[in-house]
Structures are given as structure tokens and as C-alpha cells.
Amino acid sequence: MLNGYLPHFIADTLRESKTKLIHMSTDCVFAGNTGPYYEDSFPDRMIFYDRSKAIGEVNDDKNLTFRNSIIGPDINEKGIGLFNWFMKQEDSINGFTGAIWTGVTTLTLAKAMEEAVKQNLTGLYNLVNNESISKFDLCILFNKYFRNGRIIINPSDKLQLDKSLRHRRTDFSFVVPSYEQQIKEMAD
């Protein structure tokens, strides 16, 4: 309930002020069976969390909802994100070649938020670079920039899922860098 209600409550509370809500949604609003997904694609995932995130998307002419997936360091050492998981691995792992991803690093997200405020971006925007990468290839980049190639990454096709996001909007000049650029910048 909180994911669905709170963003709209905050937006309503801010209605008469100059303050803008920047809300984060997720690619999890989609089932992953028919990607890529655009801003106007119907959120078809039926799990409670995913429905609550879809309901919470604020799409109006004052506030902004960025829909994406993020990777990056987590202040919680027990964090469950892909990057934290990868950094805890010691020997070899399986990388899913059929799990397709289109997210941004937390550093890129912060830069995009700053630029969105400057450009007064509103509505719903899929914050992606309009390219896809497999979780296997993403782990290859983590390995290259964070582990000096020490982890053996075995390709696995056991998971087939495409939650790729794409954007069609042309009113935001921020350019999301390539995945390699984002991961390299995160490592620097």
C-alpha cells in the first residue's frame, strides 16, 4: 500500500508549492514477457509489490517519475542487489545470458536527477540509454572494473526475461552513457 499511496500523497501535499516530487519506479512493473517496454506500455506484472509500484507512478505536469532499474554500491553490507552480490563472490558464478537489463548506475541516476530539475522534466520517463545488456555481460563489466578479471563467469541460459525499457520522449537532453562507461565511472 505504501508504494502505491505515498507518492500520490506527497504530490498532493506539494500541489500548492514550488517543490517537485521526483519519484522512483522500477522495471519490475513489467512481467518481462514482451519487452521492450515504453512509457505508455501497460504495467502487466501481477505480483503485489510490482502492482503497488505501478499504482504509485505519478504522471502529471509538475512532478517526475523515473522508471528504471539501478545498480551500485549499497550502504547495507547485506544488500541484495546484483552489484553487492557480485562483489561477495570468490570463484565462479553463472551469468544469465537471457536476463536482459536496461538500468543505470546510482551515479548516473544522481546526475540525471540533477539535470531533470534544471530542465523541469515532468511526467513519466524511462531513464535508460535505449540499449540492452544481459546480466552475463553486466557481470563481465563488473569483473573487468572491480575484480581485475578474477571471477570466472559461466554463461547460463536458464533464465529468460526481458524487462528492457525504452524511452520515446525527446524533451530531456540528458544522455545516459553506455553500460561500460557507467561501470567504469562507478569504479573510478
Task: Locate each region found by the language model.
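Short, amphipathic alpha-helical "lid/cap" segments that border enzyme active or binding sites
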Residues: 83, 106-114, 176-187
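Conserved cofactor-binding/catalytic machinery of classical short-chain dehydrogenase/reductase
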Residues: 6, 20, 50-56, 105
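NAD(P)-dependent short-chain dehydrogenase/reductase
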Residues: 46, 58-108
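Residue-level signal for the nucleotide or nucleotide-sugar donor/cofactor binding architecture
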Residues: 2, 101-104, 133, 165, ...
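C-terminal amphipathic/interface module of NAD(P)-dependent oxidoreductases
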Residues: 149-188
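Mid/C-terminal beta-alpha module of Rossmann-like enzyme folds, strongest
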Residues: 110-162
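Active-site "gating" loop of Rossmann-like NAD(P)-dependent oxidoreductase/epimerase domains
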Residues: 5, 24-47
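NAD(P)-cofactor binding segment of oxidoreductase domains
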Residues: 1-22
